[in-house]
C-alpha cells in the first residue's frame, strides 16, 4: 500500500519554536477510515465528515483566487454539485475526514470538546466513497490543506 508523507509544523513545548514534522500515513488505513465514516456532510457530533470545497462553490465554479487540488482521478477532479444540505439527489462532491499515522478511527460523534482531528484528512467522493488522497494543514491544525506526497 502507498505511504503518504505530510509535512506539518508543530510547536515544541520546550523551545516554544515551530518544528517541521514528517507525518506518515498508510493509504489502506486512510481508505478504511473513509469507509467507516458516515456518508453525510457535517451531520455528526464532531461535524466530520464534511464537504471539502477544494476551492469551488456548490455550483462547481472556482472561487476567486483559489486553485483546486488535482487528484489525477476523474471522479475526484470533477467540479462539485453541492446542494444546501449536501444530500440532493444529484449531488456529488468531496468529503474530508480525519486520518492518523497510527490508523485509528476518528470518533465522529464526539461532541464538545470533540476529539482532536489532528492535521491530516482523507479526501473521498460523495456518494461513492472513491479515495482521492490525503491532505494536511501545514501548521498545526490551521489554515489551508495541502496535498501530501506519495
Language-model region placement:
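Short, surface-exposed binding/anchoring microloops in extracellular/periplasmic proteins
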Residues: 2-58
Amino acid at each position: 500500500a502507498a505511504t503518504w508523507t505530510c509535512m506539518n509544523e508543530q510547536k515544541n513545548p520546550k523551545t516554544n519554536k515551530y518544528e517541521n514534522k514528517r507525518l506518515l500515513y498508510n493509504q489502506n488505513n486512510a481508505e478504511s477510515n473513509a469507509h467507516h465514516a458516515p456518508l453525510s456532510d457535517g451531520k455528526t457530533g464532531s461535524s466530520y465528515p464534511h464537504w471539502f470545497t477544494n476551492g469551488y462553490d456548490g455550483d462547481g465554479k472556482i472561487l476567486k483566487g483559489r486553485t483546486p487540488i488535482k487528484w489525477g482521478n476523474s471522479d475526484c477532479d470533477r467540479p462539485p454539485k453541492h446542494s444546501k444540505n449536501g444530500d440532493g439527489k444529484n449531488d456529488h462532491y468531496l468529503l474530508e475526514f480525519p486520518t492518523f499515522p497510527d490508523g485509528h478511527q476518528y470518533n465522529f460523534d464526539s461532541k464538545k470538546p470533540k476529539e482532536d482531528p489532528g492535521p491530516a484528512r482523507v479526501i473521498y467522493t460523495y456518494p461513492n466513497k472513491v479515495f482521492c488522497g490525503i491532505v494536511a494543514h501545514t501548521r498545526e491544525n490551521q489554515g489551508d490543506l495541502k496535498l501530501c506526497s506519495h
